[in-house]
């Protein structure tokens, strides 16, 4: 199995003068779900190279065993140093795609034409996709082959209004994920702030927050395996000829 993980290249938190980027747990936790299962992982970002880490995600209160493992993993860090440019990757080379979150994706991946076309290409090929937290915002312009918005009528989740309010960034982000999904006609599913929550609707798998990133990756991997199962046909019945 081959998975493409797409990470933000955006490092400015609106006009606050503070840094943002990807959220470390949302990269590290899915990364090891895939790696420990023997999945081949490719990392990409809009600009390529080393993507920006949201420094807050590496503060002691947000560190986990997996974020610490990632930081000590020379191979993982080497991959992160050399992410591919998003415009250089093709859907045909992968079985699935996963979008870690962080606030950064709301500024770049939500509007990136290569990201939008790539998601559309995966879905058109019948391949499941996984997205967590703020990266659900990267679905806002994705369309179906008939021109209908992907999320219209779809059940999705992502970083909630309540969670955004709790981190004090409601007035900073370019849009609120929950409000945007509802505006676009999605059925927005959520649990209490910071609870694990993963939603599957067809080929689309979404997770609510950082704690949902590992379960979302596991759900995505199961969906890829299920799709790859060979169809078992019944053996033909042999009827004895009679004179």
PLM region spans:
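Conserved, well-structured core segments that form or line functional sites
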Residues: 129
């Amino acid at each position: 199995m081959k998975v493409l993980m797409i990470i933000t290249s955006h490092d400015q938190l609106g006009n606050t003068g503070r840094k943002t980027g990807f959220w470390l747990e949302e990269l590290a936790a899915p990364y090891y779900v895939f790696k420990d299962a023997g999945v081949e992982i490719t990392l990409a970002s809009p600009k390529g190279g080393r993507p920006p880490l949201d420094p807050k995600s590496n503060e002691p209160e947000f560190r986990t065993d997996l974020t610490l493992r990632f930081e000590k993993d020379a191979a993982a860090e080497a991959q992160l140093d050399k992410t591919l440019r998003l415009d250089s990757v093709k859907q045909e080379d992968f079985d699935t795609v996963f979008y870690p979150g962080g606030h950064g994706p709301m500024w770049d991946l939500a509007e990136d034409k290569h990201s939008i076309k790539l998601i559309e290409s995966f879905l058109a090929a019948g391949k499941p996709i996984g997205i967590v937290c703020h990266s659900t915002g990267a679905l806002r312009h994705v369309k179906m082959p008939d021109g209908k918005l992907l999320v219209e009528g779809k059940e999705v989740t992502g970083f909630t209004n309540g969670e955004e309010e709790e981190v004090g960034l409601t007035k900073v982000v370019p849009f609120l994920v929950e409000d945007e999904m509802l505006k676009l006609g999605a059925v927005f599913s959520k649990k209490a702030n910071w609870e694990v929550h993963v939603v599957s609707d067809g080929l689309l798998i979404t997770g609510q927050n950082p704690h949902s990133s590992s379960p979302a990756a596991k759900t995505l991997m199961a969906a890829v395996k299920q799709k790859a199962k060979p169809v078992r046909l019944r053996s033909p019945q042999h009827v004895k000829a009679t004179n």
